[in-house]
Swiss-Prot record:
Alphabetically ordered keywords of this record: ATP synthesis, ATP-binding, Cell inner membrane, Cell membrane, CF(1), Hydrogen ion transport, Ion transport, Membrane, Nucleotide-binding, Translocase, Transport
Top EC class, one word: translocase
Family annotation (HAMAP family): ATP_synth_alpha_bact
Gene Ontology cellular-component annotations: plasma membrane; proton-transporting ATP synthase complex
Stated family: Belongs to the ATPase alpha/beta chains family.
Species, as recorded: Aquifex aeolicus (strain VF5)
Keyword Kinase among record annotations: no
Site (Required for activity): S363
NCBIfam families reported in the protein's UniProt record: atpA, PRK13343.1
Cell location: Cell inner membrane
Name of the molecule in the record: ATP synthase subunit alpha
GO biological process: proton motive force-driven ATP synthesis
Catalytic activity: ATP + H2O + 4 H(+)(in) = ADP + phosphate + 5 H(+)(out)
Amino acid sequence: MATLTYEEALEILRQQIKDFEPEAKMEEVGVVYYVGDGVARAYGLENVMAMEIVEFQGGQQGIAFNLEEDNVGIIILGSETGIEEGHIVKRTGRILDAPVGEGLVGRVIDPLGNPLDGKGPIQFEYRSPVEKIAPGVVKRKPVHEPLQTGIKAIDAMIPIGRGQRELIIGDRATGKTTVAIDTILAQKNSDVYCIYVAVGQKRAAIARLIELLEREGAMEYTTVVVASASDPASLQYLAPFVGCTIGEYFRDNGKHALIIYDDLSKHAEAYRQLSLLMRRPPGREAYPGDVFYLHSRLLERAAKLNDDLGAGSLTALPIIETKAGDVAAYIPTNVISITDGQIYLEADLFNKGIRPAINVGLSVSRVGGAAQIKAMKQVAGTLRLELAQFRELEAFVQFASELDKATQQQINRGLRLVELLKQEPYNPIPVEKQIVLIYAGTHGYLDDIPVESVRKFEKELYAYLDNERPDILKEISEKKKLDEELEKKIKEALDAFKQKFVP
């Protein structure tokens, strides 16, 4: 066995230490002194930032939610199992962010960006902070392009524009989600990407909804963010912000996106739960004082950007569930005041078989009128008025025995218009067909047709237009307004169809 000389040993040591660089790694840590109900409190972490991700010694993550004088309140992302008093928690220096990019289209993810659809890892372009300041006034442009929902009553009387925030409000089981899903399905042949955020819903209901989107081919342009009823309140609180961040990627790159928050009532409840556990002072209905700011900072991120920034848009359809039709409760009034209008769904109408159960009197679109195509404006201008007059007369008729001819005529027309606006769920109708149908309704083509035959008239009219007069639909699509020549063609087509139609 060869022995090393003193010089050789020295040379080996010299070589070993030549490349050595002393590395000092400093980590700011804290100690957990309380854990329970999805939250933890820790001493230390003196320089932690608000909404910074922190890591527990078992690998679980949390968010610094409350920064107090002597401790930090942390909301735990996921299960609290394995976190105990005395455990070390350390800073990561990273603010909560979400993956964004076109790779998320067609995927189902949780609010932390983990895939839930079994289709492998998420392909994304970069990660973006979930809390962002909304675009300022100078960066915006007034809403002027239509976002077609495929729902006759909405496209005609409560039009929605790209970049608008339109609230869908109503009691449970009145068809709120159906209106939102119809709007997603109506984007099939457009350039709009869709994001559906499910907050606090049953997993079975979410699974049914994803299956429907896949069956209709809508998952090709849709991303679903899921925080179900069985997920912790922390994930339910984060889900809308994550969905919004995904939508902003499209908006900021000159594209168009639609986001649905289903629903913000459960989102507010999750935030209330976290705030009360953090000992924040409760206000009205035990919600914290900043619950208005919670929703306003989220919904203000939906915008139509100006041409210098690429003219992209993010349209938001938040959903609010009311209790027994009480729209004057705290959260409904908050969100009504933040949004640019509301679609009010009524249980009474739903139970009468008027579906979608939209109360046209209470529903309004404050900015959508500027986005509605001129052809629809021309045919639907009198529709709202005729329906309002019909509702008044309907109440009056209950007490009056004899009616004059004009009143009877108005009631007959109203009954047919109500029937005309009924629609099967998950069956969006192209706006060109809607225009011809509503033209028929408001110009008396249905007045002598029995009410029960109106739906048959509608179905056969669409088939007639597709097979024999596709030129009319094409012309409406191209011109986007009714001139004398086009109106003449529509009248000729309706006259010809009506002669063939058998009620």
